[in-house]
């Protein structure tokens, strides 16, 4: 049975309370979640010997989460990832969005959902957070009601359910930006972690980190993760701009994806600790980001230091980047009367 505790962790500059929820199961594993950014703050899991460690990145103080560039552990939206040149057309009306990442719009803008207080409550063994995004918020059309529900169980499985409804057709693509280091937060590079993905194709990217619209076969390339492989050997490859991006920062297409069906995305594992996390999602793609720009941009960490590049890997289940400008991609549009519902599941365990 999961026990949930809560306390006031801090305050925003506007005087809003930052609540920290601790979800602890019968095995002693625990997950901490904050209502600032609907964020995963820590995940404490056993290694193969039963020794506990926090396996996600995060900051020592709640203020560290204010507008951090890494969006560590936070729920981003309205639209995760990039929209080319901050331009989109919805039902014939063009919107100019904030350009906040090179020439592109990223994660819904500076004041995106990751940088706001969410209303929050406990429902039995889950924590539910909600947010109202007004019509025109960050120049997106339509009023959007958003909910993020976090469920944790005695089998060390963390499930996130994102729901959204709108009164005008709009763009929605929600994900969580948690960074994993299965050796333990603050233990250094994740480049020797091994990843397996249920993906035989990747999106071809241009040098501005926008999909060209083409799908590339991953077989025989540094982006072929159909079998477990570490990140390090491919980190300097010229394939699909890996070197240009300083590492992996790419969307992988999930094989056999069907709308509204939860399917396996893949598994991340770390040999020394024996920890692993299996990821499931109802989304059509997953962004693998090896923390290429963590150095210098993060506040004081939970372990009291500073992160270096590659100290964590984000596994971001989501729709294709820039999908609103690619009719051949799965549609990111949400219409009145429809309910956006997407799930992400992180199943933690160990291997021999």
Regions found by a protein language model. Name each.
Residues 1-352:
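An exposed, glycine/acidic-rich loop-and-rim segment of catalytic or binding clefts
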């Amino acid at each position: 049975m999961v026990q949930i505790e809560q306390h006031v962790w801090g305050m925003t500059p506007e005087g809003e309370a930052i609540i920290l929820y601790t979800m602890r199961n019968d095995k002693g594993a625990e997950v901490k979640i904050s209502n600032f950014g609907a964020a995963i703050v820590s995940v404490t899991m056993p290694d193969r010997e039963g020794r506990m460690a926090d396996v996600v990145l995060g900051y020592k103080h709640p203020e560290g989460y204010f507008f951090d560039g890494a969006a560590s552990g936070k729920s981003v939206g309205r639209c995760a990832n990039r929209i080319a040149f901050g331009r989109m057309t919805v039902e014939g009306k063009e919107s100019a969005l904030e350009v906040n990442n090179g020439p592109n719009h990223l994660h819904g803008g500076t004041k995106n959902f990751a940088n706001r207080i969410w209303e929050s409550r406990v429902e039995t063994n889950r924590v539910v957070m909600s947010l109202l995004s007004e019509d025109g918020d960050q120049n997106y059309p339509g009023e959007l009601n958003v909910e993020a529900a976090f469920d944790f169980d005695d089998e060390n499985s963390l499930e996130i359910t994102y729901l959204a409804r709108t009164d005008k057709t709009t763009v929605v693509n929600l994900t969580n930006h948690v960074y994993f280091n299965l050796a333990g937060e603050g233990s250094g590079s994740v480049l020797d972690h091994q990843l397996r993905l249920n993906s035989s194709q990747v999106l071809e990217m241009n040098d501005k980190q926008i999909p060209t619209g083409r799908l590339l076969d991953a077989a025989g390339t540094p982006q072929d993760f159909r079998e477990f492989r570490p990140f390090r050997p491919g980190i300097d490859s010229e394939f699909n701009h890996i070197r240009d991006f300083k590492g992996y920062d790419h969307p992988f297409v999930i094989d056999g994806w069907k709308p509204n069906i939860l399917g396996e995305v893949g598994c991340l594992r770390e040999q020394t600790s024996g920890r692993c996390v299996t990821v499931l999602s109802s989304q059509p793609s997953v962004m693998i980001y090896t923390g290429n720009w963590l150095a210098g941009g993060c506040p004081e960490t939970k372990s009291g230091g500073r992160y270096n590049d590659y100290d964590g890997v984000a596994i971001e289940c989501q729709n294709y980047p820039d999908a609103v400008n690619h009719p051949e991609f799965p549609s990111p549009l949400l219409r009145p009367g429809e309910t956006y519902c997407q799930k992400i599941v992180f199943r933690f365990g160990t291997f021999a």
